[in-house]
């Protein structure tokens, strides 16, 4: 038995009553190296986890507490799963020296001005922003390993960046504009009641939303520029899908499929959670549901000098809680796949 199994890292979750918080609890409960010590959910403080999430009843999790009730002694890691703006207000109150993985948007953007422009909120934690590491695991693994504040990516951003960043880094994509078509399940909008995501509004139809002004554009612009050393103009067309989970991205490219496929295969050959499908095979969201895997497919256009790259992931796992656990594994020098090798749920 390893030392970490005998003496697991004590972790806490701040923001345990949302979908991401629930998935963090589920994943941590069966993780070989982490022990869930406390879960903060101010609105539900004093309640048992099973009162809010009956499906977690069997896990014997700690009751919800308030942030003021937190005990920081002996904590090795904090996951913060609060909404943007709220997250930074809480994180600045956490004692110095704590390792933190933040799942909000508050520390993803390197530019404070860009954050305030896209999110309409004042950024109040400039010193923390300066040391934050963008948490796209397979791209920034070395920085994540040394980091103390990891800013997990947006789910839509992750699904887009995984197929495109290698092509930019390797100089395969040379044009300065990209069109990104995306479909996302309703859980990406969070757990709070909103008219536009209730069953009667979403089922039996697909509709675009936030076309040209989705906040994840800021992340994409930032990361595309870092990978290519130039500004890439983005046309981003997200659609709300009548399903709970999943993100699917399709991006047309003026490149032959064989070149795109080979580049991605080589780039991700040592990445256990990024699966490059056989060329011409199309990925589907149901094939990654409930898992930490991202499937990427490359298909030829009728014009052989063009292709389409398609990626899928589960927004709550690889796009959020699973990504956070994977980053935590790297921070503590555990096996990258620890606690994350569950197969997708199908059908």
Where on the chain are the PLM-derived regions?
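N-terminal Rossmann-like NAD(P) cofactor-binding subdomain of oxidoreductases
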Residues: 2-204, 209-211, 229, 299-302, ...
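A residue-level signal for beta-strand positions that form part of recognition/binding surfaces
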Residues: 8, 133, 177, 233, ...
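Predominant activation on well-ordered alpha-helical scaffold segments within soluble catalytic domains
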Residues: 25, 161-165, 217-221, 265, ...
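Residues in well-ordered beta-strands of folded domains
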Residues: 40, 65, 137, 181, ...
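Contiguous C-terminal substrate-recognition/catalytic subdomains in enzyme active sites
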Residues: 197-293
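C-terminal active-site/capping subdomain that shapes the small-molecule cofactor and substrate pocket
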Residues: 249-347
